[in-house]
Design a protein with these regions (language model features):
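Thiamine diphosphate
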Residues: 1-74, 78
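Aromatic/hydrophobic pocket-lining residues that form π-stacking "cages" and hydrophobic walls in ligand
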Residues: 58, 85, 102
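Active-site-proximal alpha-helical scaffold in enzymes
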Residues: 74, 83-87
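Hydrophobic or amphipathic alpha-helical targeting/insertion segments
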Residues: 89-100
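Conserved small/polar residues in nucleotide/adenosyl-binding loops
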Residues: 102-108
Length: 112
C-alpha cells in the first residue's frame, strides 16, 4: 500500500500551482517534502548552504520570473534564519512562500 503523507501533499500543491522551482536547505526535518519532490521529478530543488541564502535565492527567482518564490527550510533556528529574506521580499513586494515541516510528537508521559 502506498503512503500519502504531508510531503506528498506539499509537493502536489506546489506542482498544481505552477511552482516548479524551489530553493532550500536539506535537513532531517524536511526530508518528507524533498523525498516527495524527488519522487515525482517534476519540481526542481535548488539547494543552498543556509536558509537566509535560500530565501534570497527564492526572492531573486521570483523577481526575475514573475512567479512565486518558494523556500523550504528546516525547523526552529533554520526557519528563523529565513526571516531576513522574508522581510526583504515583503518590502520589495515580492511573492515568497516559506515552507517548514516537522513531525508531530507526543509528550512521553501521555498514553494513547
Amino acid at each position: 500500500m502506498n503512503e500519502y503523507n504531508v510531503g506528498d501533499l506539499i509537493s502536489d500543491f506546489l506542482f498544481e500551482n505552477d511552482l516548479k522551482t524551489v530553493f532550500g536547505v536539506v535537513s532531517v526535518h524536511n526530508i518528507p517534502i524533498l523525498d516527495a519532490i524527488a519522487k515525482r521529478n517534476l519540481i526542481k530543488f535548488v539547494p543552498a548552504r543556509g536558509e537566509m541564502g535560500a530565501g534570497h535565492m527564492a526572492d531573486g527567482f521570483a523577481r526575475s520570473s514573475d512567479k512565486v518564490g518558494v523556500v523550504i527550510t528546516s525547523t526552529g533556528p533554520g526557519a528563523a534564519n529565513v526571516v531576513g529574506s522574508l522581510v526583504e521580499a515583503r518590502f520589495a513586494g515580492t511573492p515568497l512562500l516559506p515552507v517548514s515541516y516537522t513531525h508531530l510528537t507526543l509528550p512521553t508521559n501521555l498514553s494513547v
